[in-house]
């Protein structure tokens, strides 16, 4: 049960079962991809009674409310690795022995292209309207461009409508806003796990909403299955488990392409998940923040907005942002597309606290309307660089005999290091993570994504070759000094793009 922190709960050695409700927020990150960093000897705080002001913290401040203490606890529990990295960040000239960051999912490959485009004269206009309060949904000129952009790149059957667009400062705010307007305090969303762990905080810190994990595993049971595959049967089991524990589930979160797996849901799978949600009157939030970062054409990505007929359009809400696809995680632009006017209006009300400046809105409109630059310059070069970086890292992993999951989308490879754990526990996983950090390379460990199998790590490859080379060299040094179990993972767990999987 996902509840408020209480004192002195030590890390468990195994995840709950496949229909369990999330029990640990262990190191979920702070919404800026810092999900890989809790101290291994830090005691976890037992969660109980979501929203219960009587919940106790092992260390609370006399200056904070109980809610404030919980919020501070999330920050404190997820900062160590990221803070360590920033105190000793690698710099080729100033700090060549510093930490290489292969843990934060950012695209660092195309700054040259972005810098030139964002510095052009058409980006620098200032008008009185841009310095005044906007429509909180976003300026109409931006919402019109977002609708045209999504219509084109999501391949929607009919043009999308600007009145269904809401603009916020990133997908973290969108998750938070949707959780707040769709759920009562203590209600929950289903989410396939492993998943991007910062979503835990996005839906909880304001909305007081839980996550019910639909736990996936690496086992492959036949020719038509793949590692960590989501099925309707698993969704049904998780929903039944939540109901049996008295937890009201209001929605389903899907990330497509998936983070941390890099997996892609086929149109048939998406249709099945949406029909499951309709049967149970669940909202579906689809995060498509990596939709233009599919660098293998054979991966066969399709947006949910490309489906001819949504089973329940009033409960289907789609998110996208520029942080990943355009390498602008510091610029903070995200958008919601929903046909539900009540949901759009409620989320827009929260844009008072999560809106964009008029100048940023203008720049985003200019960028999104420039299809010539996007199609002829940026996307081809970005995909080529992502593919080259992925090839470099995957070849290193093969040389080390390390299985991995990767389907040609996103910035990361899901790496199987289970054979390097003396015991199959999350304590050993964190100890291995710390050895990487001590050897000046930062990765993200599986428990940060609520993976139920100890020993999986997310490795980000979307960086320059010289940093990848040094980072992989440091990974190799750690693993070569680590004893291995006699039997590694079976070869069928290596999953790479070889054509559509459906």
UniProtKB/Swiss-Prot annotation:
Positions of substrate binding: 106
Enumerate the UniProt keywords alphabetically. Pyridoxal phosphate
Q: Name one GO molecular function term.
A: pyridoxal phosphate binding
- Where do the segments described as Disordered lie? 15-35
Q: Please identify the protein, giving its name as recorded.
A: 1-aminocyclopropane-1-carboxylate synthase-like protein 1
Return the InterPro entries for the record: Aminotransferase_I/II_large (IPR004839), Ethylene_sulfur-biosynth (IPR050478), PyrdxlP-dep_Trfase (IPR015424), PyrdxlP-dep_Trfase_major (IPR015421), PyrdxlP-dep_Trfase_small (IPR015422)
Q: PTM N6-(pyridoxal phosphate)lysine: list the residues.
A: 324
